[in-house]
C-alpha cells in the first residue's frame, strides 16, 4: 500500500451495468397479480419487443417480503448452450 500512496486494489472490480450481472425490468412489477394469463401476456409482449433478450420471471412473497422463485421464461433463438 505504501508504494502507491493510497489504498490500492490490484484485482478488484465493481460490477457494471453492461457486464451481464444486472437485468433491466420490463414495465412496473405486477403487484397483487394472481392471474397467470396476465403474466404470460406480459412475457409475450416483452418477447415481441425484445426478441433477442432473455426473459426472467421473479416471484416475491408479499408477506415475508422475500424472493421465492426466479427462472428464465424465454431464451432467444440466437442463444446456443455450449
Curated annotation (Swiss-Prot):
Q: Which organism is it from?
A: Sinapis alba
The UniProt subunit note reads as follows: Heterohexadecamer of 8 large and 8 small subunits.
A GO cellular component annotation in the UniProt record: chloroplast
Q: What is the recorded name of this protein? A: Ribulose bisphosphate carboxylase small subunit, chloroplastic
Per its UniProt record, what InterPro entries does this chain match? RuBisCO_ssu (IPR024681), RuBisCO_ssu_dom (IPR000894), RuBisCO_ssu_sf (IPR036385)
Gene Ontology biological process terms from the UniProt entry? photorespiration; reductive pentose-phosphate cycle
The answer, when asked if Chloroplast is one of the entry's keywords, is yes
Miscellaneous section: The basic functional RuBisCO is composed of a large chain homodimer in a 'head-to-tail' conformation. In form I RuBisCO this homodimer is arranged in a barrel-like tetramer with the small subunits forming a tetrameric 'cap' on each end of the 'barrel'.
> Any idea where this protein resides?
Plastid, Chloroplast
Q: Which Pfam families match?
A: RuBisCO_small (PF00101)
Highest taxon listed in the record's lineage: Eukaryota
| Protein role | RuBisCO catalyzes two reactions: the carboxylation of D-ribulose 1,5-bisphosphate, the primary event in carbon dioxide fixation, as well as the oxidative fragmentation of the pentose substrate. Both reactions occur simultaneously and in competition at the same active site. Although the small subunit is not catalytic it is essential for maximal activity.
The text of the family note is:
Belongs to the RuBisCO small chain family.
Amino acid at each position: 500500500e505504501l508504494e502507491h500512496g493510497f489504498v490500492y486494489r490490484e484485482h478488484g472490480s465493481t460490477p457494471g451495468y453492461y457486464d451481464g450481472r444486472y437485468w433491466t425490468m420490463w414495465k412496473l412489477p405486477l403487484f397483487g397479480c394472481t392471474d397467470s394469463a396476465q403474466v404470460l401476456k406480459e412475457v409475450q409482449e416483452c418477447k415481441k419487443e425484445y426478441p433477442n433478450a432473455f426473459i426472467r420471471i421473479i416471484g416475491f412473497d408479499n408477506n415475508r417480503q422475500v424472493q421465492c422463485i426466479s427462472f428464465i421464461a424465454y431464451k432467444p433463438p440466437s442463444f446456443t448452450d455450449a
